[in-house]
Swiss-Prot record:
UniProt keyword terms in alphabetical order: Isomerase, tRNA processing
PANTHER family attached to this UniProt entry: PSEUDOURIDYLATE SYNTHASE TRUB1, TRNA-PSEUDOURIDINE SYNTHASE
Described purpose of this protein according to its UniProt entry: Responsible for synthesis of pseudouridine from uracil-55 in the psi GC loop of transfer RNAs.
Binding residues annotated for substrate, in chain numbering: H43, Y76, Y179, L200
The organism's taxonomic lineage, starting at the top: Bacteria, Pseudomonadati, Pseudomonadota, Gammaproteobacteria, Enterobacterales
Name of the coding gene: truB
Protein name, per record: tRNA pseudouridine synthase B
Length: 314
């Protein structure tokens, strides 16, 4: 007879993890989930094993609002190895072509300019996008290439940092859906020498503060210290979390009086003052502005519930 599954904690919020190199996003997600003993956890946009940096991990009810971070802008620092092209467009892949690096500074500046602004990008075969229900990297590992449509992306800023020998360092501020590996691969082809990513760090996601990032090692140290001092680890871990509504921080706030919020939480649209004319809104209730979910302004100007927070007993 199987043992009953142990129930985790109903903990809600967003941890800004500084993902280490060499681990998959799912691996670090599972470690954080165990450290927090959380019932539910999910990340908001995977980083390649080679990459480091900001990986927001949503716990509990915050997972309902993680989709809003998937749509947010991101900023990266990347170092490319020039003269070598790999099958994965990064250092984890196999070298498939080597060519001399002969471009001039003017040619580099001209090539970089073509990647700024609104452009279209054909995703790498080594990505998690799906074709006929199967992830592209699964086809790639079988040596199968399938058709991919170009997707519109926006590169808000592409900063040249340095070019030394066969290394090129850039900083990229981009929209959702942008593959930095693909930018580097495409840039290498435009320069005629090939290139692949050797270092990639996600600096920021949306407007999250960089100084709130924490490492796995720090979390594990806190757990060990709490155990030594005989205090619950949650006492030190939970203050590290950002609010559960922080993934939707770009949306305007509508505050409902308690007399109206009870109807909203039961799935009914409600009328209120001071709401925008249309679009999604964060909905709070009462004088303490407690977050209760996401709403959308309907055709009659009412706030209709879209995603609601489940209230757990304390």
């Amino acid at each position: 007879m199987s043992r009953p599954r142990r129930r985790g904690r109903d903990i809600h919020g967003v941890l800004l993890l500084d993902k280490p190199q060499g681990m998959s996003s799912n691996d670090v997600l599972q470690k954080v989930k165990r450290i927090y003993n959380a019932n539910r956890a999910g990340h908001t946009g995977a980083l390649d094993p080679l990459a480091t940096g900001m990986l927001p991990i949503c716990l509990g009810e915050a997972t309902k609002f993680s989709q809003y971070l998937l749509d947010s802008d991101k900023r990266y620092r990347v170092i490319a190895r020039l003269g070598q092209r790999t099958d994965t467009s990064d250092a984890d892949g196999q070298i498939v072509q080597e060519r001399p690096v002969t471009f001039s500074a003017e040619q580099l500046a001209s090539a970089l300019e073509t990647f700024r602004g609104d452009i279209e990008q054909i995703p790498s075969m080594y990505s998690a996008l799906k074709y006929q229900g199967k992830k592209l990297y699964e086809y790639a590992r079988q040596g199968i290439e399938v058709p991919r449509e170009a997707r519109p992306i926006t590169v808000y800023e592409l900063l040249f940092i340095r070019h030394e020998g066969n290394e090129l360092e850039l900083e990229v501020h981009c929209s959702k859906g942008t593959y930095i590996r693909t930018i580097i691969d495409d840039l290498g082809e435009k320069l005629g020498c090939g290139a692949h990513v050797t270092y990639l760090r996600r600096l920021t996601v949306s407007k999250y503060p960089v100084d709130r990032m924490v490492t796995l090692e720090h979390l594990q140290t806190l757990v060990a210290q709490a155990e030594q001092q005989g205090v619950p680890a949650a006492q030190w871990l939970d203050p590290l979390l950002m609010p559960m509504d922080s993934p939707a921080s770009d949306y305007p706030v509508v505050n409902l009086p308690l007399t109206s919020s009870v109807y909203f939480k039961n799935g009914n649209p409600v009328r209120t003052t001071g709401a925008p004319l249309k679009g999604l809104v964060r909905v709070t209730e009462g004088e303490d502005d407690k977050f209760i979910g996401m709403g959308e302004i309907d055709d009659e100007g009412r706030v209709a519930p879209r995603r609601l927070v489940v209230e757990y007993p304390a």
